[in-house]
Amino acid sequence: PVRDGRYGPDERYPMVLQSLLGPGWAVAEEGLPGRTAVFDDPITEGMNGLRLINPILMSHAPLDTVTIMLGTNDCKARFACDSYQIAQGIARLTKKALQTECWRDNAHPDVLVIVPPVITPAYDRLIFREEMGPGCHERCAGIAARLAPMLQGLPGVRFLDANTLPGAVCSPVDGMHMTKEAHRALAQGLYRELTASV
């Protein structure tokens, strides 16, 4: 987190990943602060990933792999959902990505679903406590265990819990955004995952 905006492109994990992968790969970044997996935000317009994923993917087609890391913003108290319902939303979004006609040479889809780092319990004493509302840590902490079985057996879907990657943690500044070091740790984990079968 930075107080006057976002990290620069070369500091965020997609472009760090690009630097690790090298010139044989092209990473397209589509991050948006506040985006949800499936919820329309009554306060901030245009945040529903389910409504946007088709045109986003088609704008970058043809694609070999799609990565999805959402869920943090779905934990906001105003959506009144628990971890199971948030996981259901991510699973629904994943299925829509699989069905989008964006894949190179009509190849089999390859979607890597990433569970984001868990919001720390201290977030409710920090700068986003009013924006997020109560109970976010608990909801966020439960996503991985509920999402994994929902995705198991889906052809073309891989699962990665960022919380299993050393250093991929939320910042003590706000308890919910990653530090530069965490972005690099996540990029390194994604590099290992994406190149393991190459």
Stretches found by the model and what they are:
Residues 23, 47-198:
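Alpha-helical cap/lid subdomain in secreted, periplasmic
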Residues 1-32, 38-43, 55-58, 66, ...:
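Serine-esterase "nucleophile elbow" of acetyl-processing enzymes
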